[in-house]
């Protein structure tokens, strides 16, 4: 469920930001960040991906313009164009994330992989921890089991072994303005 995943990823980012320099990036299309973090950003993930595509070696100098701040958390706002996420090659995403961490000195980078990433296991292979939502929803649980089975069949046991399942209870009143305060 996208809402549960969003709530979990933001909660993890918020907790990590209390213990170190943390950047949050989401690859979900039409995420709705503006309504959650209420920050006026100038650039976004589309701009960051464009800078990366133009110059893999020096993009970190331009990406700082796409990073916004909310309390102690740094984040890159939603892509303004869904195709920008879809167009990036799966193997480039890991390079993109690792270069940001290395060049900009983030202790933690929290990624909401979302549905926009093709072959997400390429990015997952770069992650130290992968949090998976458990909502009690039968269909969502079956989707995850099928995904886990696929990883095992493909010999990607190392990725499946890093999954940490977290119970997420969705609040019925998710549309209120204080989502950040309730994470």
Model-derived regions, located:
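General structural signal for secondary-structure boundaries
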Residues: 41-44, 56-60, 88-92, 157, ...
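Short secondary-structure transition/capping segments
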Residues: 22-24, 69-78, 152-166
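Phosphate-binding loop that captures ATP/GTP phosphates
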Residues: 18-75
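Charged, low-complexity, helix/coiled-coil-prone segments
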Residues: 2-8, 33-48, 85-95
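Short acidic, S/G/P-rich loop/turn micro-motifs used as interaction or catalytic elements
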Residues: 2-4, 31, 80-89, 116-119, ...
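Walker A (P-loop) phosphate-binding motif
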Residues: 1-25
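Cytosolic-facing regulatory segments adjacent to core modules
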Residues: 55-69, 75-115, 141
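Conserved catalytic-core segment of NTP-binding enzymes
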Residues: 95-182
């Amino acid at each position: 469920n996208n809402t549960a995943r969003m709530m979990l990823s933001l909660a993890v980012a918020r907790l990590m930001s209390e213990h170190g320099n943390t950047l949050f990036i989401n690859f979900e299309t039409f995420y709705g960040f503006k309504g959650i973090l209420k920050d006026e950003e100038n650039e976004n993930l589309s701009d960051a991906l464009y800078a990366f595509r133009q110059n893999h070696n020096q993009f970190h100098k331009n990406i700082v313009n796409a990073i916004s701040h909310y309390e102690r958390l740094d984040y890159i706002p939603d892509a303004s164009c869904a195709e920008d996420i879809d167009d990036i090659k799966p193997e480039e995403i890991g390079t993109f994330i690792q270069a940001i961490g290395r060049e900009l000195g983030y202790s933690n980078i929290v990624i909401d992989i979302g549905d926009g990433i093709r072959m997400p296991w390429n990015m997952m292979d770069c992650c130290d921890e992968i949090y998976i939502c458990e909502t009690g929803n039968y269909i969502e649980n079956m989707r995850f089991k099928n995904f886990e089975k696929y990883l095992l069949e493909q010999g990607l046991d190392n990725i499946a072994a890093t999954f940490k399942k977290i119970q997420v209870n969705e609040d019925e009143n998710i549309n209120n303005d204080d989502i950040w305060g309730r994470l």
